[in-house]
Amino acid sequence: SLSVSCMTYEASTVSDAVGSDGDDALRTRMMRYTVAAMFFAGFAGKGIRGIFGDIGSLMPMLILLVSFVVLFRISGRSLLLRRFPTTTCLFVAWCALSCAWSVAPLLSAEYTVLSVSLTLVSIAVAVALPLTELVGALILAFQWIIGSSFVLEALVAFFGHGPLAPPIMWGRGLLPASYYWIDGLLLKGGPIQGFPGNRNPLAFVALLLAVCLILRYMQTKRSRLATFLWL
C-alpha cells in the first residue's frame, strides 16, 4: 500500500510539473504572438490608420497593450528599477526637461508623455521575452508585413482597376498620388507600397527581416529552407 501511494505521489508530481511546463510554454507563445502583433502595429501603423482612421486605430492598439499587460502580469514578470537602462532613461528625462524652454510647452508635454509611455512599454517587452524569443517575435511581425503586402499588391494588380486608396478615403474621388495605399504596379515591375502604404518603410522592414533571419540561422543552424525562401 505504501509503495502504491509513493508511486501515485510521484506520478502526480510529474503530472503537475508537465502541466506547469505546458502552461509556461503556452504563456510564452501567447506573449510572443502578442509582442509580434505590437511590432506589426508599430512598423505598419500607417496601414492600420488607413483602415481604421487616426482615432479608430487606437482601439486595436489599446487591445494589444491590455493583452500584453495581462500576459506580463500572469507570467510573473515585473519592472524593477535595476532593469531600466541608464542611458535611455537619461535621454528621455532630458527630452522631458526640454519642455521648460520649448516654444510650445503643451505640445512638448504631450510628446513627452508619449515618449515615456513608449519607453516603458519597450523596456517591458525586453523584460517579457528572452532575446531569442524577442528576435522570433520581430521575425513574425516582419513576415506578416511582407506577406500581407504581397497579397494586397497581387489582389490590386490582378483584380483592381488602378491604384487603391485606403479604406478611410473611399468615395472621395480622385486623390493626389501620394494618398493612395496600393499603386498596383506589381505586374509592371514598379515599386510596391505594401501594407504600410509606403515603399521606404516596407524596404526597411524587408532589410530588418533579412538581418534577423540571418542572425537566427547563424545562432541556431535551423530552418535553413524557410530562411532561404524568405530571403
Positions of predicted regions on the chain:
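Structural signal for the C-terminal ends of transmembrane alpha-helices
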Residues: L65-S78, A124-L134, C212-K221
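Hydrophobic core segments of transmembrane alpha-helices in multi-pass, intramembrane catalytic enzymes
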Residues: S57-S67, E110-S122, N200-R216
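Membrane-interfacial loop-to-transmembrane alpha-helix junctions, especially the N-terminal start
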Residues: L26-A36, G76-F91, A137-F142, L225-T227
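Lipid-exposed faces of alpha-helical membrane segments in multi-pass integral membrane proteins
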Residues: T34-A37, A41, L62-V66, T86-L97, ...
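Transmembrane alpha-helical segments and their membrane-water interfaces
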Residues: V103-L155
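Alpha-helical transmembrane segments of multi-pass inner-membrane proteins
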Residues: I139-P167, G171-L231
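N-terminal signal-anchor transmembrane segment
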Residues: V4-I74, L97, W101
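Helix-loop-helix junctions and helix-breaking kinks within/between transmembrane helices
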Residues: I48-S57, W101, P105-Y111, N198-N200, ...
